[in-house]
Amino acid sequence: MEERTFSRPAASATVLVGTQFGDEGKGKLVDYLSDQYDIVVRYQGGANAGHTICFDGKTVVLHLIPSGIFNKDCICVIGNGVVIDPNALMEEIQKVEELGYDVKGRLFISHNAHLIMPYHKRLDSLSESCLSGDQKIGTTGRGIGPSYEDKFARHGIRVVDLLNPKVLEEKLRDNIEAKNKLICKVYEKEEIDVDAIIGEYEAFDKVIDPYVTNTQLYLNRQIKAGKTVLLEGAQGCLLDVDHGTYPFVTSSNPTSGGACTGSGVAPNHIGKVIGVCKAYMTRVGNGDFPTELEDETGEKLGEIGHEFGATTGRKRRCGWLDLVALRYSLTISGVTELALTKLDVLDTFEEIKVCTSYMLDGKEIFDFPTEHQTLCRVQPVYKSLKGWMASNANAKSFAEMHPNAQAYVNFLEEATGVPVTFISVGPGRDETVFK
C-alpha cells in the first residue's frame, strides 16, 4: 500500500501576545508590523485595554480598534471574542477620522461580538465596591467582566441584535428586569431606566451598521485568497482567565489559544506566535507580583517608563524582569519569537537584575505557580547584569547597540530558548532594532 501523508495548509496568520501582565508595548509593535499584513484582528478583551501608538509626533491610545488602523492599506477587524462598548467605539472611530484616517471600508466588526451595556458597568463597580482589601481585583470598571458573564450565561446581547430593534428591545427588557432585581435587592441601589437604554442603543444601529459583518467567514475567505493576518491580543498571558494568576485576572483569554476562538481563524492557519516582553515588569491593580520593587528603584522605573495605565491612568507597579513567569507564558502560548520593548528605560541603571528562579519554603523552584496561595509566598532569586549607562536610540542594528545591552538581550534568549527578533529602544517607530 502506498504511504500517504496529510498536507498542511500554508500558514498565513501570526498571533501577537503579551507575555506579562499587559502593558508590554504591543501597540507599537502592531503599528510597526501592520504594513507587512493585509488584515489586523483584535480577538479578545474590551475597552479595558489600551494600546499606545507614537507616530508623527503624536501619541494615540486605542482601546478597541486594532492598532493597524494607522496604516492606510491595512484592514482592521474587531473579532467575535471582543466585548464592545458602543459609546467607546464611536468615540474611537471619531478620533481616528479626526487624525485624517478613513475608517469606513477598513474596519469590520463581528456580528457575533457581545455588547457592554450600562448595567454591566454599574454591576462592575458595585461588585468591586463590596470587596475589601486584598480581595479587590482592581477592575477598570468598564463592564468587561459582567458582559462576559452574560455571554457565558447565554443571555448576552450581541452586535447583530442592534440590527433588529424588536429583538433588541425584548432582550434589553428581559435583561434589565433581572439586573434591577440584583441592583435593588442585593446592592440596595436605584434601578436602571430601561426605556432610556432602549432609546440609546437603538440609535447605535444606524451608526454601526456599515461596519458589521460575519468576520469569521470574512477572515477565512481572505486567508484562502492568500491574504496575511495579524491577530492582536490585549492584556497579557499572566492575566488569562484560565492560565493566569487567578482570581486576579481578566475575563477572557489573551493567550494564543484565544486568538482562534476569538476570531474564528482555524489553528492550522497560525504560522508563528510573537510574544511581547517588556525589559522589566509592571502590573496594574491587585494580584501577586514576585519581583515588585516598592523602593526608589521601582519608583525610578515608573518615572522613566511613564508607567501609568493607558485606560485608567492608574500608577503601575514596577519590578525587575521575571524569567520564571516569562518562560511559563512562552510555553502556554507557544511563542516562537520575542519582541523586547522599553529597553531604553534601563539606560541609566548601573546594575540590572533578572529573576531566574524562586525560593519557596526553603526550596528553589523554576516553575511558575499560578495559584495565589503559593505565588504569594515565593521569593525571587536574582542574577545581576551590568547596565550600559548609554542610549541605544540611534542604533540601526544589533551590532551598533552597547555591548552590555547586547549581553542583556543575549542572556534573555539563552534563558528562554526563544530568539529575540525585535528590540524597542525608544517610543518612536524609528527607534527599533531588528536582530
Swiss-Prot record:
Residues engaged in binding Mg(2+): 23, 50
Pfam family, one: Adenylsucc_synt
InterPro entries: Adenylosuccin_syn_GTP-bd, Adenylosuccin_syn_Lys_AS, Adenylosuccinate_synth_dom1, Adenylosuccinate_synth_dom2, Adenylosuccinate_synth_dom3, Adenylosuccinate_synthetase, P-loop_NTPase
Details of cofactor binding: Binds 1 Mg(2+) ion per subunit.
Pathway involvement of the protein, from the record: Purine metabolism; AMP biosynthesis via de novo pathway; AMP from IMP: step 1/2
Gene3D superfamilies: Adenylosuccinate Synthetase, subunit A, domain 1 (3.40.440.10), Adenylosuccinate Synthetase, subunit A, domain 2 (1.10.300.10), Adenylosuccinate Synthetase, subunit A, domain 3 (3.90.170.10)
Residues binding substrate, per UniProt: 310-316
Location within or outside the cell: Cytoplasm
Description of how the protein assembles with itself and partners: Homodimer.
Protein name: Adenylosuccinate synthetase
Organism whose genome encodes this protein: Chlorobaculum parvum (strain DSM 263 / NCIMB 8327) (Chlorobium vibrioforme subsp. thiosulfatophilum)
